[in-house]
Every structure is written in C-alpha cells, then in structure tokens.
Amino acid sequence: MAVPAIETKMPIPVTRADAALGAEIGVDLSRTLSDDTFAEIEAAFHDNIVVCFRRQTLTNEQHIDFSRRFGELEIHIVKKYLLPGYPEILLISNVRNEAGELIGLADAGFTWHSDTSYRQFPSRCSLLYAKEVPHRDGVALGDTVFANTIAAYEALPAATKRRIEGRRAIHRYSERRRVPGSPRPKLTAAQLAETPDIAHPIVRTHPYTGRKALYVTAGECVGIEGVPDNEAVPLIAELDAWCVRPEFLYRHRWQVGDLLMW
C-alpha cells in the first residue's frame, strides 16, 4: 500500500509579482500539506489576493481536496460543463468535440466580474488549473487580468468614498455582459429562479483581513438601492473604470501546470 508523501516543515517560498497584487508560491500541492504549511499558504493568499502554484501535476481528487481546505465547495450553476464524475470542477475551454460542441465554458473571463457575486454568500475563492494553454507563434494566449479592488478603494477620492458609504449595489447574474455571439447557454427558468437579484455593499469588508474593497462591476451590477438609475448606472460605470486602472492590475500569463487561486 502506497503511503502519501508528507512535506517537511520549512517556510514556503513566496515570490511577489511586480504589480499591485499577485505572487507565486513554491509548494507541490500533490503532497500532503501540514496544517502549518496550509496556514502559510492561506496567509500568503490573503496578503497577495492572487497566488499561483506553478508546475503542478494534480489529479482531479487532489485539486478538489486542496480546494476543500478553504471551505465548502460550490457546484456551478451552468451544469452543462461540469466535469463528469467531479461536479465540483467546471471546465473552461474553447475546444470542440467531434460533434462540434464546446467541451467547456468558452467565454469565462471575457468581461470584468467577481465570481458568484450574484449569490447571497459569494465564493471565498476560485482555483483554476491549467491543463492545456493555447499558443500562437510560440506565445501563450489567454492571459487573465485581475484587479486589486482594495487598493482601488484606498485610492478613491474622499468625496467618492463619502458618496458610496453605506450604499448597496444590485447584482444580477442574468445581466452579466456577454461578448457578441457568446456560446454560453442561456439560463433556464429554474436556474433564473436560483439567482434572484442580490444586493451587496459597494464597499465590502473582507471577512478574514478586515480590509475594505470596492465590490461592484458594470458587468453584472444593474443598480444601487435607493438611487435613481440615471445616477446609479453612471456611478457603477465610474467605479468599474476606476478599479481597472493599470496601477491596480496584475496580468497572469498562463503555463501548463499552473494552479491559480483568487
């Protein structure tokens, strides 16, 4: 009977990106992690917001087991692209099978959003594992860009902070922006019933670090409670544009074997 390899206790290597967020963590996630090592990973995640574990060789079970250490796993509402036998894993892909059908969600990340902000209790984090990465002329494609909305909030003019204090934006999954001709399947009536409008504070306090962040995107926020639409929609657009200023961004360039967590 094989015995799982157990890592020895050493400080984990964390290399920060030259950006407003992001870091690489040098840990082999296929090994059994002690509670102390996991605590270091968790702290690095909280400090850097987006973390990447390079050169991973994970089974589906290992991917799920590591993810579960951060909390209860969710099943994505788009059931069509759940990995058979592993419903905790959603396939992201633009590859088509022999019948010409997409094998995964092809437009994920095409617009700015915060995962599952349309739920009453949004996800704590997401973990995306790169099994294949497209290339053209030797250059990897499909970069993913992230925004540090903590830094964005902290840099807001004082007048804007006062304007949004105590306000709640209305998130609507069915209004998420789509690229023209998006192949994403439309939600059924039952799925729409699962995702009613949800209001979250525009300035959201992180439950683990206590830091304040902007929590609003033009991609799926349709209004602000108690504010007329002719004022709310421009304000949402203004905050959205502020969050994605270059000084708040990190661009992740994918490699096969990356496990990216945000």
What is each model feature region?
Residues 2-259:
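Non-heme Fe(II) oxygenase catalytic core, chiefly the N-lobe of the double-stranded beta-helix
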